[in-house]
């Protein structure tokens, strides 16, 4: 993407994630519980659980923690009955934001999400107000220096839909979200380990923010990310570091 480094953004994202690993573990445990409750405890027949368990491994979560979360989900233990709710809204300058939550109290959650939006210059939207601006996809990002031709051949053979080389030399591979695990397995079997691999809501168009606007937008995103019930925050805003 012209004007900013996707690779730098990913490294920043990973560093921020490492800094709040405990919070990430809490979110992953909730996701594992819900995935196991809805689709069973076998990762081979439950794609959502497989994805959550893979994320837990990437976050260095102990296997015992993962197993306990699966058991709680399958057994319907207290704490496993979370409700999935998506909120949509706008940041400054109309930037689109999607907030995915898992909650046991929707009244509390909607109040906290609305408060974060209003406190930091955004506002809540209605269902569907911004979701159409995003595509639900599997996304992989490979480091600059990765062989573009070899990766493209492996990715397309694995079932990926698109391979893009960014201005900073990193390479992005996109696939249908349902095919994520199969594509990931095929790429890794071919020797290609992504620095970032996730199912995400990818914006169709991005809006760059710099200076004071970037700082304001980052505060809003951080406020939403830090809410206990929030699992994921997606936006078409790109924070450009100057």
From Swiss-Prot:
It is found in: Cytoplasm. One of its GO terms (cellular component) is cytosol. Coiled coil: none annotated. One of its GO terms (biological process) is regulation of DNA-templated transcription. This is Probable transcriptional regulatory protein Bcep18194_A5621. NCBIfam families: PRK00110.1, PRK12378.1, YebC/PmpR family DNA-binding transcriptional regulator. It comes from the Bacteria. Keywords: Cytoplasm, DNA-binding, Transcription, Transcription regulation. Belongs to the TACO1 family. The keyword DNA-binding applies. It comes from Burkholderia lata (strain ATCC 17760 / DSM 23089 / LMG 22485 / NCIMB 9086 / R18194 / 383). GO terms for molecular function: DNA binding. SUPFAM superfamilies: YebC-like. Its main location: cytoplasm. It holds the Pfam family Transcrip_reg.
């Amino acid at each position: 993407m012209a004007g900013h480094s996707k690779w730098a953004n990913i490294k920043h994202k990973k560093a921020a994630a490492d800094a709040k690993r405990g919070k990430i573990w809490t979110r992953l445990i909730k996701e594992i519980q819900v995935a196991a409750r809805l689709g069973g405890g076998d990762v081979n027949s439950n794609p959502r659980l497989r994805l959550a368990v893979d994320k837990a491994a990437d976050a260095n979560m102990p296997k015992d923690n993962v197993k306990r979360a699966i058991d709680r989900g399958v057994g319907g233990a207290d704490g496993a009955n979370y409700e999935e709710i998506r909120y949509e809204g706008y940041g400054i300058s109309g930037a689109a934001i999607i907030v995915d939550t898992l909650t046991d109290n929707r009244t509390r959650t909607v109040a906290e999400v609305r408060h974060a939006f209003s406190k930091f210059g955004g506002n809540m939207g209605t269902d569907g107000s911004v979701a159409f601006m995003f595509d639900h996809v599997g996304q992989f990002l490979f480091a600059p220096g990765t062989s573009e031709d070899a990766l493209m051949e492996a990715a397309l053979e694995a079932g990926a839909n698109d391979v893009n080389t960014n201005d900073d030399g990193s390479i992005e591979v996109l696939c249908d979200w349902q095919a994520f695990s199969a594509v990931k397995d095929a790429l890794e079997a071919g020797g290609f380990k992504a620095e970032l691999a996730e199912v995400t809501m990818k914006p169709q168009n991005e809006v760059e923010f710099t200076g004071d606007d970037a700082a304001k937008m980052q505060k809003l995103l951080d406020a939403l990310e830090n809410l206990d019930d929030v699992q994921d925050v997606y936006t078409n805003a790109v924070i450009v570091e100057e």
